[in-house]
Amino acid sequence: MTNSLDKKVALVTGAGRGIGAAVAQRLAASGCRVILTARSSDQLDRVREQIEACGGEALSIVADLTGDEDVEHLVQQAQTWGPVDFLINNAGWGKRASVVRADVADWDQTFRLNLRAPMLLAKLLLPAMIEKVAGAVINIGSVSGKRGEANGAAYSASKFGLIGFTQSLYEEVRENGIKVAVILPGFVDTPLIPPNKQLDRSKMIQADDVAHAVHYVLTSPPTCCPVEITIRPQRTPYR
């Protein structure tokens, strides 16, 4: 038997497009009340309108998660439907550059968005979940968090850190009935991946594949928690 998501409140970061939008749409279709957040109001409004057109409930809140004040304000605004049941930390950013040539300011932004923001959001939202003895924190990581690559040191390090955070948080709150998981997709076909003649995008992981994994965690039996899920393409997308 799976858990009902009807009327559960889900906060999805980076929900304006790509994986975040797909997660928000799938959860709304499953009955969740979805709070969308990103930096672009236009993108958020488009996703919210798509959800509402299908009969779902959604609220959009513009926020820059690299700033603590924005994060705290987001958490306050997210109480519209009551305490948040599910936190989906999807927002992420990275700029490719060698360690020698990288701008340290880019490192700071990468770590603040990819690691610090998920930790701060969890810190602020978990007390209500602990009180209810129910809830979930799902972090969208990357296979780059399992194996580093050249010119991606900060991004990989932030995703390695996200895995460590997930594992630690799981141990802290597992007895409170709260599911904690990290999903590690490979190359996903989103607007962030530029056109490349060597890539067959139809064979790439799709955003909804990741959304399906999120839904799987949230509806898994209360006796188990899929703490880490790696998603790889079934067939190689390289021509």
Please tell me what each predicted stretch does:
Residues S142:
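Residue(s) in the substrate-gating loop at a strand-loop-helix junction
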Residues G16-R17:
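Conserved glycine-rich cofactor-binding loop
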Residues A122, S158:
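Active-site helix of classical SDR
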Residues D42, V62-H73, V104:
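The beta1-alpha1 cofactor-binding region of Rossmann-like NAD(H)/NADP(H)-dependent oxidoreductases
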Residues C32-R46:
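Conserved glycine-rich Rossmann-like NAD(P)H-binding loop of the short-chain dehydrogenase/reductase
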Residues S98-V99, D106-F111:
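Substrate-binding pocket helix/loop in short-chain dehydrogenase/reductase
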Residues E175-N176, V182, L199-R239:
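C-terminal helical subdomain
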